[in-house]
Amino acid sequence: MYVTVEPGVTWLELYETLKPLGLRTPFWGPFSGKVSTVGGSMSFHALSHGTNNAVSADSLLSLQVVLGNGDVIETGSQGKGSQTSRFFRYYGPDIGGFFLGDSGALGIKTRISLKLKKYPEGFAACSFGFPDFEHLFQAMRDVAKLGVVSDNHGLDPRKQKTAIMEMENTNP
């Protein structure tokens, strides 16, 4: 299953369209929120909020791109001459990767096809504390192995505090 969108579609618009159908994309959207566009996420190789499906490119099946000379190309299994549907990104050499994280410098994305998966039957959030990073990492690894969690976050308060102090010292 896949969905094809124009690059100006926001993650919120896509979410609201797909949810009534019981579907979603593996990548939920970047840190900048639901108002971010799908095209922007691909152009800046956006990261999401957790450990699974955390990179926008992981949901990509194909791109339609207009090159600087005006040529229009299709990547993935929908590439030129292919009579197949958009089912697989890595059809031959993955030239789609050239246009991920390029900030639009290598071409203008005009159509983006993304994988779809079933929307989860349930949703819950919880928070835990750990005595140190090693225990946090072990717990995250064990949960990820179960395959039942879509996102798994972890923060080390000491590292966060250090990062904030460094930012304050370099940006007074």
Give the positions of each predicted feature:
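FAD-binding subdomain of flavoenzyme oxidoreductases
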Residues: 4-7, 11-145
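Glycine-rich N-terminal segment of FAD-binding domains in flavoprotein oxidoreductases
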Residues: 1
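C-terminal substrate-recognition/cap domain of FAD-linked oxidoreductases
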Residues: 128-132, 137-172
